[in-house]
Amino acid sequence: MVHQYKLNGYNIVLDTASGSVHTVDEVAYDIIAMYKENTPEEIVEKILEKYGHLEDVTKDEILECIDDIRSLEEAGKLFSEDAYENLATNFKNNSKVIKALCLHVAHTCNLNCSYCFASQGKYQGDRALMSFEVGKRALDFLIENSGTRRNLEVDFFGGEPSLNFDVVKRLVEYARSIEGEKNKNFRFTYTTNGMILTDEMIEFLNKECHNVVLSLDGRKEVNDHFRVDYSGKGSYDTIVPNFKRLVESRGGKGYYVRGTYTHNNVDFTNDIIHMADLGFTELSMEPVVCPPGDPYALIDEDLPVLFEQYEILAKEMIKRKKEGRPFTFYHYMLDLKHGPCIYKRITGCGSGTEYMAVTPWGDLYPCHQFVGDEKYKLGNIFDGVDNTEVQDEFRSCNAYAREECRDCWARLYCSGGCAANAYHATGSIGGVYKYGCELFKKRIECAVMLQIAENE
């Protein structure tokens, strides 16, 4: 299968199974589109009919182009066969290790964001803070179930984890004290709204955290529409200076300033540009996922605007890189030469199998977006996973699990998509969140184009 599209002056041909990317002229673009359904003679006739007025488009040139396409096909770089389906099933069945935990150290928050999927940090339950004892047991559980894997990921999440920062510090200290003995290397991520970041916190995060995720929706009026405290006051004026201090002192370590866009700001590229103009260079912006009846939910009529926004963003990134003002966008970080292995491309994030979320009480869920939904509770950190039926559902989530995905050119980029988004949109982790699919495919098209432009 190949996917062909035109963007920013490039004629792009993407081979689905091999991942090969080709940029071609108009004639070759049309020949590739005809190649599988027409004989060489038919292709020559149709191409001459369309391009025969051009001096360099002759029968011999067309036949030579067909030969080149055939050579690429034989080399597995065009119309290549997908031989990966069995790998998906075998890998998930054989993989029994846990590589990462999302520790919900705070089921409470100091912001009252109305679009929050976690019900202002409560996850449809009670407010709570994780104790050191539960967190310590979670780290031990991760080590016990990680097999021979050395690098382990731990995300400090909420709610707002800064409301339980002393426990965060003690857990990091504990992990560092045992990682040598256990032959493990912990990499910590910390997600914060930035409201109560102190210099002491920043110093600790910069020392210990491999990555920090900083929540900001962009322009002040956009951010302060949803991201408000319990008195209704916007957060922008508080968090932007805090984030600047953190990033400026981070010394090149990883971070993301991450926002959410809604129906209210479908011109979200302006929010990304605003964040870049503030001096932030590692950026992400996610579409809101919420019930379709919500006033801020994205609607079908928004799609053409959103597609255009992603294209505008890619072009702006090319422009700024040439000007010496580059920034990165998470969804455009596509490595065409040294990307993830085929197993990762097939199986995705590993939620429910290699990755789990831990509540303040030690309950296990497939990921943070399932926390509070009792039917998706997997077990707990004290007794382990006992809901193997649900875990097996997640083992089957891959690029080939859904019939709709089998004929999709983007399946080896999305790995079957986000199980949580599918569940919230369709009621099943085996469903297809079609709106999200359309956005994802547009992002991949832009990301590939961006790679082509930057490698010219």
Predicted regions located by residue number:
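Short acidic, hydrophobic short linear motifs in intrinsically disordered regions
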Residues: N38-G52
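Conserved alpha-helical substructure of the radical SAM core
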Residues: D56-L72, G76-E203, K207-E208
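Radical SAM enzyme [4Fe-4S]-AdoMet core and its adjacent flexible, acidic
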Residues: H225-D237, K244, E248-G352, K377
